[in-house]
């Protein structure tokens, strides 16, 4: 399933929200979303299960929950506007969905930056089979 998410990120191009999220991650962390965040831990990438492995994986868990709370929105494809002012992401005008999606992505990108010190390479390309514990609730 994660492979599909990686392919989606690569195929979406500049017209999709996943591309924008990737750009936010790059600007906030200095790391490319692929490979650093697309298959990290139990929640970074498509879907998620089990317990988050660390603070970075928890950022992805919270991001999944944020997307899950959106109604009638398409967070992986809806394009939104945002800018950066003095290093701060500012979500722009748009529909309520676009604004909420932007805020979810912004929170995750900032969370990744705030947890760079505890990022562990051993959780990159983490096997799903090791994520079988009961999932937390959002």
Curated annotation (Swiss-Prot):
SMART domains: PA2c (SM00085)
Disulfide bond entries: 42-131, 44-60, 59-111, 65-138, 66-104, 73-97, 91-102
Chief location category: secreted
Cited Pfam families: Phospholip_A2_1 (PF00068)
Record site: Important residue of the cationic membrane-docking site (MDoS): 121
Site annotation Putative cationic membrane-docking site (MDoS): residues: 79
Molecular function GO labels: calcium ion binding; calcium-dependent phospholipase A2 activity; phospholipid binding; toxin activity
Record's signal peptide: 1-16
Region (Important for membrane-damaging activities in eukaryotes and bacteria): 121-133
Site (Cationic membrane-docking site (MDoS)): residue numbering on this chain: 133
Site (Hydrophobic membrane-disruption site (MDiS)): 130
Residue(s) at site: Putative hydrophobic membrane-disrupting site (MDiS): 19, 26, 32
Residue ranges of the TM segments: none
Subcellular location: Secreted
A GO-annotated cellular component: extracellular region
Known tissue expression: Expressed by the venom gland.
Site (described: Putative membrane-disrupting site (MDiS)): 31
GO BP terms in the entry: arachidonate secretion; lipid catabolic process; negative regulation of T cell proliferation; phospholipid metabolic process
PROSITE patterns: PA2_ASP, PA2_HIS
Entry keyword set: Blood coagulation cascade inhibiting toxin, Disulfide bond, Hemostasis impairing toxin, Myotoxin, Pharmaceutical, Secreted, Signal, Toxin
Subunit description: Homodimer; non-covalently linked (probable alternative/compact dimer conformation).
Entry similarity comment: Belongs to the phospholipase A2 family. Group II subfamily. D49 sub-subfamily.
PANTHER family assigned to the protein according to its UniProt record, in alphabetical order: PHOSPHOLIPASE A2 FAMILY MEMBER, PHOSPHOLIPASE A2, MEMBRANE ASSOCIATED
Protein name: Basic phospholipase A2 homolog bothropstoxin-II
Origin organism lineage: Eukaryota, Metazoa, Chordata, Craniata, Vertebrata
